[in-house]
A protein has these predicted regions:
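Sec-dependent N-terminal signal peptides of Gram-positive bacterial secreted proteins and lipoproteins
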Residues: 5-30
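Core segments of small alpha/beta cavity-forming domains
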Residues: 31-93, 247-249
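Surface-exposed, charged secondary-structure patches
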Residues: 82-133
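Hydrophobic/aromatic beta-strand elements that line small-molecule binding cavities or substrate pockets
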Residues: 103-110, 146-152, 322
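Short beta-strand edge/turn micro-motifs at domain boundaries
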Residues: 136-190, 194, 333-338
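N-terminal capping segments
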Residues: 187-270
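...with weaker cross-activation on analogous glycine-rich loops/strands in unrelated enzymes
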Residues: 264-334
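Low-complexity, Gly/Ser/Thr/Pro-rich intrinsically disordered linker/tail segments
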Residues: 334-340, 348-365
Length: 365
């Protein structure tokens, strides 16, 4: 009897211990999941609200998403303010209007606790725009960005204290010196272009660019680069590497001793933007259509066709390469690239600073 009582007491004690130790942890774990879901949903809502604010010119809505009591919060807000103004300026120059900005967000990591969190995410943003004199024709392009967000909860709302991402518009905050009216008039006088007779090699180049333009590609491709090649974004940039891939994998240009990629690495003409531009021109594989400021070359840009490329020059140095992948409803050339990933984006969008010069280059397939 005594032995039976001891066993009963032991069992009751074990049950109490299980309730005491296991149940609280379950509740805490559940609370952590709820909190992470809350911060994730709040981050996604911020992106949606910011895009709506850009469309509506609602600067107050953008301002409400930042903690302006911190210098990093102020800087992040001011950057978004400049971005909104630039896009409005570009619309005016182009005779166009953005009608929808749609983000697709993939959360990579969430760290933190209580009221402070850090979020790593990627965002593939679709920009839809029309030309004001032809609103029935909707144009679409995609831009992909990687973000690190620091967020805190204040007065029941999650707001941004710090944000880092490679902004595709950071080199484009000045359109003031452009003769907007004459540029707009010329753009609106153009018509849609027909590329149905494009060669198979050019068509294949465009297909490769569409498939492997990373975060700017379609969701079905997983927002990834071609894993057959190294990603050089963290080592100076991947734009020329991508352009070389497009020409080799898609356009069937053969590698050689000067232009090459293998397991040991890549030549400068394959990997470096300046080296790529120079190699393509001086090897005879490409020829220059035009070179100069936007006002000097924008009319010539209508001679670009899919499979050609644009090189962007700052202070005498080629800093970026984009591949031409199409044209919009007004025949305006569209480009795709790596670094800040772009998919069929107007060739000057994000490159409107007065100090930038453009190389429009025809590739000889």
């Amino acid at each position: 009897m005594k032995h039976s009582l001891i066993k009963r007491v032991f069992r009751i004690t074990m049950v109490i211990l299980v309730i005491f130790f296991v149940c609280p942890f379950k509740n805490i774990h559940g609370e952590e999941i709820d909190e992470k879901n809350e911060i994730i949903n709040s981050a996604k809502q911020i992106f949606e609200d910011r895009n709506k604010a850009i469309l509506n010119g609602n600067l107050k809505l953008i301002e409400s998403k930042y903690d302006k009591n911190t210098k990093y919060g102020i800087w992040a807000y001011e950057h978004e303010e400049k971005k909104m103004k630039y896009l409005k300026n570009w619309e005016e120059k182009q005779g166009a209007k953005f009608i929808e900005i749609i983000p697709d967000i993939v959360i990579k990591r969430v760290r933190g606790s209580d009221d402070k969190f850090s979020i790593n995410l990627i965002c593939s943003t679709e920009y839809k725009y029309i030309y004001k004199d032809a609103p029935k024709f909707i144009n679409s392009c995609r831009i992909g960005t990687s973000h690190i967000l620091n967020m805190v909860k204040k007065d029941g709302r999650w707001i941004i204290t710090k944000e880092w991402y490679k902004d595709p518009f950071e080199d484009s905050l000045n359109l003031d010196n452009l003769k907007v009216d004459s540029v707009k008039q010329y753009i609106l006088s153009q018509s849609k272009r027909d590329f149905s007779s494009m060669t198979d090699r050019r068509r294949s180049s465009v297909e490769y660019a569409d498939r492997y333009c990373g975060i700017a590609s379609e969701k079905k491709y997983g927002y990834t680069y071609n894993k057959k090649y190294r990603n050089y974004n963290s080592r100076g940039g991947d734009c020329a590497n991508f352009a070389s891939q497009v020409l080799h994998e898609g356009g069937k240009f053969r590698k050689n001793s000067a232009w090459n990629y293998d397991r040991s690495g890549a030549t400068s003409s394959w990997l470096n933007a300046d080296g790529f531009k120079n190699y393509m021109i001086y090897s005879g594989r490409a020829s220059v259509i035009a070179h100069g400021s936007y006002e000097k070359v924008y009319k010539a840009s209508y001679r670009l066709i899919p499979g050609d490329f644009v090189a962007y020059e700052k202070k005498g140095d080629i800093t970026h390469i984009s591949v031409v992948t199409g044209a919009d409803s007004r025949g305006y050339s569209l480009v795709s690239c790596h670094n800040t990933d772009r998919n069929r984006v107007p060739w000057d969008l994000g490159w409107s600073d007065k100090n930038i010069k453009f190389w429009l280059v025809h590739v000889n397939y």
